């Protein structure tokens, strides 16, 4: 049965791609397809096309006035795909009437963003489990078991995860759960736009470093309706170029997938398709059909129409690093362990005594200089003046006399005097400031830094990597090594020179290749010379990595509150007095670099915060700009 192209797209289940279509009739010019504004706008009767994908071409947005449920929309405008804003996704109030509708409409996949949550209005009785009314159900993956398509789901009860499967035939009213996470527009486009539905979002933050004009009114942080405009991606018979068709093209099509030999079409694979391949299917020979512009890969590795060998896919480690500088924008890098440059240590800054406790190590005694004063009402605790030096040892609990006897967590240190040292006890709640004194002049390889020190760690390139023509790290004023990141890579080589291989990041490469049949492959991949490179990533990619890695580890406990309002008042007064006091000249003799204080998310002190905290960092920063710095709250 013939359908309009729009009707076909509306009913298309993306899990059934690719599909083969035959053009039945429509308004068009005779002859083959031709291109206008990057889209195919004409198809001949009888033309056969294999549909390989349905992508969002652009995003239209409408500003909502009033409540989300009954908002009046203003004139829609295009929201650029690279818009540097952060959004909160509002739950869709329209129910899904079956599991099949959810899987056909919502993106469910291996990504951390591909696990949507729904709840059901009634109890669902399973063989060994009862899903309660309103209980959040996480959809993890879709798979076929014994010929039946099932959805792998899970619920969490008392911190215990319970797994189960639901068939596509399961019916009922399923509603989206509230989502407290914050997303970029790119993430929403890829994972959070249900097919054939709009998405209401709330703008929570906007980067003022964007060069283009802000499409929103000044100080706007309201709700929007996002309306995607799709394009169909496909390939014509005997052609290797990808064609793009707008669903609004006035033609009728017929699905002939079951009766047509798909081998007449060249086999095109995207980066996602390569990711889904099993390890046994590698190596393969392929021709690059399309490659994303603006990638930071060496131009000689991947070019259009170049034949390459994709040897395998695997996980590899990178060190996430950021420039140490007081102004923005900062640059961010992924450094491979194979990097051959050498580093020297740079001093770290610590805003509280609690941060000193986290940073101390068994390898060496942490030596710091105070940059802010601290006065205490307790004789058992040590006052601090600007320029005081301390050797940090360990934390313990001590008793102080204040409205009775109470216990306080302290950091036991040695205060360095001219010729002697004296014991000092600094309360962990102390909101002072310290700069590290570096005595270590050794040059380190990146692998040595990984094994001998804890993140975050400050360094500067002392000897550049001579094996790299342009070492982008050598020009940086300093680097903060923040985290060890594990990511997915493809091992790729030039077909003409298969011995020299490169690690190519799968998640940051938008590439389409055509498999080349009949080409001989290298016999032994174990003899290949693997080359890695330092990858510069965007700020969006950086924050996504920090957010994901932070969600995998438990956060450290927050520093304890100040014990009394009186002492807080006295401390604040003393800090105000110290603002007029310059650092003593003697401090310069310690060869301490004193960069300006970094924001908390870049100094690394919050790098292990839970994902919810990381997601809300934009809101916090915006509040800080309006109302001044926010004080951390934590139990005693």
Swiss-Prot record:
GO terms for biological process: adaptive immune response; negative T cell selection; positive T cell selection; T cell receptor signaling pathway. Transmembrane segments: none annotated. Residues 590-600 have a biased composition (Basic and acidic residues). Its main location: cytoplasm. Disruption phenotype: Mice are viable, are born at the expected Mendelian frequency and present no gross abnormalities. They however display a blockade in late T-cell development with defects in thymocyte selection. The number of transitional CD4(+)CD8(int) thymocytes as well as CD4(+) or CD8(+) single-positive thymocytes is lower. Thymocytes show defective positive selection, resulting in fewer mature thymocytes. Negative selection is also impaired. A greater percentage of T-cells have CD4(+)CD25(+)Foxp3(+) regulatory and CD62L(lo)CD44(hi) memory phenotypes compared to wild-type T-cells. Residues 1-260 are annotated as: CABIT 1. Residues 583-636 are annotated as: Disordered. Residues 261-520 are annotated as: CABIT 2. The keyword Cytoplasm applies. The modification Phosphoserine is found at residue 586. Plays a central role in late thymocyte development by controlling both positive and negative T-cell selection. Required to sustain and/or integrate signals required for proper lineage commitment and maturation of T-cells. Regulates T-cell development through T-cell antigen receptor (TCR) signaling and in particular through the regulation of calcium influx and phosphorylation of Erk. Interacts with PLCG1, ITK, GRB2, and LAT. Belongs to the themis family. This is Protein THEMIS.
